[in-house]
C-alpha cells in the first residue's frame, strides 16, 4: 500500500519547516517542495493533501510566487496559511488588498465552530499573525469562518471542495489551538491515518542505505554530537564494517569530549573508528580570522580535507555520511528563503569534494533524530546530549580563535553544564552553553583592579531549534555558576546571561 503523503508547498515563509513538523507530530508523512515544483511532478507524487505555506511577498507583486490553478482540480484537500491563504483567494478569483493596519504577533480571533476545521476549538481564541495584505473578498463557493478586529477574513472555507485558508499561523506554538486545527485537517477533513513513525523511518532508511551503498565503502564524519552519532549508528546498522568513522579532534571540542567519543563508539558500538588529532592544523588556519562566516567556511573545508586524506589512506571510499538535519538546511537558505547563516554541514562544503554525500537525517527535526536514536538502542544519555555545532567552540569564541581563549570558554562551559546537571535541568533545557564574546571589562578582585574577559551564558527552551525562548534558570543556579566561573577560570571577571529569544536572535552567537 502506498504511503499517505501530505505535500507542503514552500512559498518562502520563515515558519515553513514548522508546518512539516506539525504534520509529522500526528504521525503523517509529509514532504516539502518549492512552489516552482511543476503540476506534473505534483501529480506523480499522488499527494493525499496539500498545504500552502506563508511567504514574504504580496500576491500582486510582479515576481511573486504563483501556483498552477490545476492543483485545485486534483480532488485533494488544500490548506493555505498566510500567503497561501491569500494565494488561494487570488488564484480562484477573490480579492486581496493591502491593509492600513498591519497585524503582527498575538491577536484575538473569532472562529466559526460549525466549520470542521475548527471543531473542538473555542470560538473566541488567540492566534499568531504576521501579515500586511489581507483577503477583502473570498472566491466564489467560499464562506468566511474566522475574523479579527483588523482582518475580516482571518479564515475561509469551501467545504464542498475541501479548500481552506487561514491568515494566521497555526504551526507556531503561539497559536494555542494550532495542534487541534492540524488534527482536524489531517484526520477529519482529509481522512488520513497515522502510518508514519520513527520506527518505520529507521527501517526504511536502513534498507535505503543498503540499496544505495551496495558493497562500497563509506566514511562517516563523526563528531560525537547527537546528529552525527545517530547518523553513524543508522548507517552502521545498514552496512556494518563497510563503514569507517573518522573523528576529527580539531581542538575545538568541549572538555573531555574527545576521549568520551572514542570510548563510546569504539568500545560500545564496535565501530571502525579513526581519531585524528588536527588541533594545530585547524588553529593555524583560523589564525587572524575574526569574521564568523569565514571561520565556518574554513572549518568546514578543513574538515573535508582531513576526511579526504584519511580516505586516501583507506583505499577506495565512495560515500561520506553527514548528520545534516532539517534546521541545518533551512538556516543555509533554500530557493525560497533568505540565508540566515551558512551551516557547517551545508554551506562549508568545497565544490571539489570527492565523495557522494549520504545524509540520512536530512528530513528530520532534532526531536525526531532523538526518537530515531532511541529506536536504534543508542544510550539515553548520548541521545539527549547537548546540541553542539560542527565548528565547535570555534564559533563560541567570538573574534579570533586562540588556544588561550578556547581554554577559558571550555572551562566555563564545563562548569555551566555541571551545575545544570546538578540542578536536574539537563533535559528540561533544549541547549545551554558558555561563549566568549570578546568583551573585556573592569573589575575588582582582592585589592586590585582587573581588566578581564566576559563570559556569556546562553540557555534556551525549544522543541525544534526553529524558534526558541531563553530559559528561566533559577537564580540560585545562575548565582552558583557565576561565582564558580569567576573563581575557578583564570582571566574572567564578569558573567552575563543572554535573555533573547529566537527570533530575533539565533541560538548561537556566531
Curated annotation (Swiss-Prot):
InterPro entries: Class_I_gatase-like, GATASE, GMP_synth_C, GMP_synth_GATase, GMP_synthase, GMPS_ATP_PPase_dom, NAD/GMP_synthase, Rossmann-like_a/b/a_fold
List of residues binding ATP: 223-229
Any one GO molecular function term: ATP binding
Documented EC number(s): 6.3.5.2
Start and end residues of each GMPS ATP-PPase domain: 196-385
Enzyme class, broadest EC rank: ligase
Residues at the active site: 82 (nucleophile), 169, 171
Purpose: Catalyzes the synthesis of GMP from XMP.
Protein name per Swiss-Prot or TrEMBL: GMP synthase [glutamine-hydrolyzing]
Organism: Clostridium acetobutylicum (strain ATCC 824 / DSM 792 / JCM 1419 / IAM 19013 / LMG 5710 / NBRC 13948 / NRRL B-527 / VKM B-1787 / 2291 / W)
Amino acid at each position: 500500500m502506498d504511503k499517505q503523503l501530505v505535500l507542503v508547498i514552500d512559498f518562502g515563509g520563515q515558519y515553513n519547516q514548522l508546518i512539516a513538523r506539525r504534520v509529522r507530530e500526528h504521525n503523517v508523512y509529509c514532504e516539502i517542495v518549492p512552489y516552482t515544483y511543476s503540476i506534473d511532478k505534483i501529480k506523480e507524487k499522488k499527494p493525499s493533501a496539500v498545504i500552502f505555506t506563508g511567504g514574504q511577498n504580496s500576491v500582486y507583486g510582479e515576481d511573486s510566487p504563483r501556483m498552477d490553478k490545476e492543483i485545485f482540480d486534483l480532488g485533494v484537500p488544500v490548506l493555505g496559511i498566510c500567503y497561501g491563504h491569500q494565494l488561494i483567494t487570488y488564484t480562484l478569483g477573490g480579492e486581496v488588498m493591502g491593509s492600513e493596519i498591519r497585524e503582527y504577533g498575538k491577536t484575538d480571533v473569532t472562529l466559526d465552530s460549525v466549520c470542521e476545521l475548527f471543531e473542538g476549538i473555542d470560538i473566541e481564541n488567540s492566534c499568531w499573525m504576521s501579515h500586511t495584505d489581507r483577503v477583502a473578498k473570498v472566491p466564489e463557493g467560499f464562506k468566511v469562518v474566522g475574523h479579527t478586529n483588523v482582518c475580516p477574513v482571518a479564515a475561509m472555507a469551501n467545504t464542498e471542495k475541501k479548500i481552506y485558508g487561514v491568515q494566521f499561523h497555526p504551526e507556531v506554538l503561539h497559536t494555542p489551538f494550532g495542534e487541534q486545527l492540524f488534527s482536524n485537517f489531517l484526520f477529519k477533513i482529509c481522512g488520513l491515518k497515522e502510518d508514519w513513525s520513527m520506527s518505520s523511518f529507521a527501517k526504511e532508511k536502513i534498507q535505503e542505505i543498503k540499496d544505495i551503498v551496495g558493497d562500497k565503502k563509506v566514511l562517516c564524519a563523526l563528531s560525537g554530537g547527537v546528529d552525527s552519532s545517530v547518523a553513524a549508528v543508522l548507517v552502521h546498522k545498514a552496512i556494518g564494517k563497510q563503514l569507517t568513522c573518522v573523528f576529527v579532534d580539531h581542538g575545538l571540542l568541549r572538555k573531555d569530549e574527545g576521549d568520551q567519543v572514542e570510548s563510546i563508539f569504539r568500545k560500545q558500538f564496535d565501530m571502525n573508528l579513526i581519531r585524528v588529532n588536527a588541533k594545530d592544523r585547524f588553529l593555524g588556519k583560523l589564525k587572524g580570522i575574526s569574521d564568523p562566516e569565514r571561520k565556518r567556511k574554513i572549518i568546514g573545508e578543513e574538515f573535508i580535507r582531513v576526511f579526504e586524506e584519511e580516505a586516501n589512506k583507506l583505499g577506495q571510499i565512495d560515500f561520506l555520511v553527514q548528520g545534516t538535519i532539517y534546521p541545518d538546511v533551512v538556516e543555509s537558505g533554500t530557493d525560497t528563503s533568505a540565508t540566515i547563516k551558512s551551516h557547517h554541514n551545508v554551506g562549508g562544503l568545497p565544490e571539489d569534494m570527492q565523495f557522494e554525500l549520504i545524509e540520512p537525517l536530512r528530513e528530520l527535526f532534532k526531536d525526531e533524530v532523538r526518537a530515531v536514536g532511541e529506536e536504534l538502542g543508542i544510550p539515553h544519555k548520548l541521545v539527549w546530549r547537548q546540541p553542539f555545532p560542527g565548528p565547535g567552540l570555534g564559533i563560541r569564541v567570538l573574534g579570533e580563535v586562540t588556544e588561550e581563549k578556547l581554554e577559558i570558554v571550555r572551562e566555563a562551559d564545563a562548569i555551566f553544564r555541571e551545575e545544570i546537571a546538578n540542578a536536574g535541568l539537563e533535559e528540561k533545557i533544549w541547549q545551554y552553553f558558555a561563549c566568549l564574546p570578546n568583551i573585556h571589562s573592569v573589575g575588582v578582585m582582592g585589592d586590585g583592579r582587573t581588566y578581564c574577559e566576559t563570559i556569556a551564558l546562553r540557555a534556551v527552551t525549544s522543541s525544534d531549534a526553529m524558534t526558541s525562548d531563553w530559559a528561566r534558570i533559577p537564580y540560585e543556579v545562575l548565582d552558583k555558576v557565576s561565582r564558580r566561573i569567576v573563581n575557578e577560570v583564570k582571566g574572567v571577571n564578569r558573567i552575563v546571561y543572554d535573555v533573547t529569544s529566537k527570533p530575533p536572535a539565533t541560538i548561537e552567537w556566531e
